[in-house]
Amino acid sequence: MTKSNISKDNGPLDEVEGIKERSNFLRGTIAEGLEDRITGAISDEDNKLLKFHGSYQQDDRDLRDERRRKKLEPAYQFMIRVRTPGGVTTPEQWLVMDDLAHKYANGSMRLTTRQTFQLHGIVKWDLKKTMQGMNQALMTTIAACGDINRNVMCNVNPEQSDVHAEVYEWSKKVSDHLLPETNAYHEIWLEDKKIVDSREESEPIYGSTYLPRKFKIGIAVPPSNDIDIYSQDLGFIAIVEEGKLLGFNVAVGGGMGMTHGDTNTYPQISRVIGFCVPEKVTEVAEKVVTIQRDFGNRSNRKNARFKYTIDSRGIDWFIDELNERLGWELEGKRHYEFDSNGDSYGWIEGKDYWHLTLFIQNGRIKDVEDYPLMTGLREIAKVHTGDFRLTPNQNLIIANVSSDNKKQINDLVEKFNLTEGKTYSGLRRNSMACVAFPTCGLAMAESERYLPELLDKIEVILDESGLREEEIVIRMSGCPNGCSRPALAEIAFIGKAPGKYNMYLGGSFNGSRLNKLYKENIGEEEILNTLRPIFIDFAKDKQKDEHFGDFVIRAGYVEEVKSGLDFHSSKEDVRS
């Protein structure tokens, strides 16, 4: 294994650190910017602070050239992301989100890879009304983005209802414990009473500059790794024996993002360092976060994530630092096994209720011709007495359906032609894409709008090879930030330019291994021509129960990646 080249020494602070320091606990001049009717945008500094409030300024990239020719400013709009720990929401909240999507956004909702909602296409003048509408439904967007702990993920786990309920409660406790304490959110969006003297405020966990970069936490319940535990900055793996939650293994230092061409950036898988009882979870989470607060790189944001803090100083250093802050040591890690990181579709019977998992292609909730998905889910929400669970794979579980109500829900599913994905290929059922164009400002290539079209063509090859039902994890990301967690997929495409992608192979079916670059900067024709012989080879030579990601390593298409430090190929290894 190679060693990290990242320096432990901090240089001059990145400009974002100054913005946070002088923001008066995330207020900045956001309130004034919202009132400025001259432009549909806010200032650059406020845009960096707005993330902490759960929103990003964007523009419609499909319209950029046209508006530039007309000497108009970009078609500025905003994305709002909700904070929903564990992805659990009520039917009433679903209906509110549906209404806000039509009233203020682009008429659609996006289920994200971190189990929450995003609304796109909101203009500046409607931001506050949208936030207030969410708040009235007991939803918030605070800390859904920004250099802070983000939405805490939790295994949806309909098969083990009692365990899920207990683990879900811990995800909420961790989420609540790590919320910022500033009153800025309530002052700006909910028009609460302003604090006259900001010296009355403090952030005991974060401090006035919060974290160096985003921080992500998730809780998994084996054997399902649907939350991709190894991608999290901090992960808790539930240890369950005879239906009883004993505690959690603690995993640290995962993360997906990187920068094209910079080998000092890379995806990384987390490492399991020990075990704690449930009552210690929030304490462990807080101490881990404070270590990143104090030692994370605040000079170079490309190397500011927690994985680089650990890799530059060493896992042994981190464990010593954590033990010192805790005042006690984690117990030895307990045995666990994951079998997959996907979803189980269709009806599943729990202890007292039924749960229905629907396939939502790339998480987009909208009505299209012959598929009134948004309308169908709206009608279900009107009669559903349980809850909705947003899965980490961008799908939706209609959960806690009573036996008496099951037929009514099923009739609505059939009436609106909603799908469990059973007729789709195993590849499509395990597919995932980020939003990318036209709203994401970081996108280098299409993702959500293109992956379904590419899958249509790949499925032709699967049919030819007899692999249509083979479960294979495939993911696409429009840029190397990796919101769809592509580095853990058996097949992944990461955008480099419009129509061009890096192709990666060799992730594991259960999400425990990174993939490896196989071809660089290729378009659709080469993608299909590359996959065809590999699929044929797989169909012919796969061993019993062997998954595609394991096969391509055994067959020599790519080398196994055991750590993010070994992720980048040398030039002679790359096929171009």
From Swiss-Prot:
One Pfam family in the UniProt entry: NIR_SIR_ferr
SUPFAM superfamilies: Nitrite and sulphite reductase 4Fe-4S domain-like (SSF56014), Nitrite/Sulfite reductase N-terminal domain-like (SSF55124)
Annotated protein name in UniProt: Sulfite reductase [NADPH] hemoprotein beta-component
Biological-process GO terms, alphabetical: cysteine biosynthetic process; hydrogen sulfide biosynthetic process; sulfate assimilation
GO molecular function: 4 iron, 4 sulfur cluster binding; heme binding; metal ion binding; NADP binding; sulfite reductase (ferredoxin) activity; sulfite reductase (NADPH) activity
Gene: cysI
Keywords: 4Fe-4S, Amino-acid biosynthesis, Cysteine biosynthesis, Heme, Iron, Iron-sulfur, Metal-binding, NADP, Oxidoreductase
EC number: 1.8.1.2
